[in-house]
Amino acid sequence: MKTITIPRQNLTQYEIMLIMRPDLPEEKFLKFLSEIKEHAKRNLALEFNLSNRGRRKLAYAMRKFQDGIYIQFNFLGSGYILNSLIKRLKLEESILRYIVQKT
């Protein structure tokens, strides 16, 4: 397999905040988080940091849910990594909302 090296100066720091369904079973939740970590590593994301912000009440109902589980990802990567992660997030039905920020 050919190794790809990306110059560090071409990488950008990104933050993704997710709101997930509160009724999601623990094993599916943990499986989703591990899949996202593996996806980021496969696509050469550097300094990948994941933090669970916990369950919080939403300001307004989303898909009839009053609560949501907040997850925050921080990573250093290229636009390709970001686009592949966004495609993966769009396929996940348990995500109520997400936002991407360049930090």
From Swiss-Prot:
InterPro entries named in the record: Ribosomal_bS6, Ribosomal_bS6_sf, Ribosomal_S6_plastid/chlpt, Transl_elong_EF1B/ribsomal_bS6
Highest taxon of source: Eukaryota
GO molecular function: small ribosomal subunit rRNA binding; structural constituent of ribosome
One Pfam family here: Ribosomal_S6
Keyword annotations: Chloroplast, Plastid, Ribonucleoprotein, Ribosomal protein, RNA-binding, rRNA-binding
This protein's GO CC annotations: chloroplast; ribonucleoprotein complex; ribosome
Signal sequence segment: none
Compartments, as annotated in UniProt: Plastid, Chloroplast
GO biological processes: translation
Family according to the record: Belongs to the bacterial ribosomal protein bS6 family.
Function statement: Binds together with bS18 to 16S ribosomal RNA.
Name this polypeptide is given: Small ribosomal subunit protein bS6c
Source species of the chain: Cyanidium caldarium (Red alga)
Gene this chain is encoded by: rps6
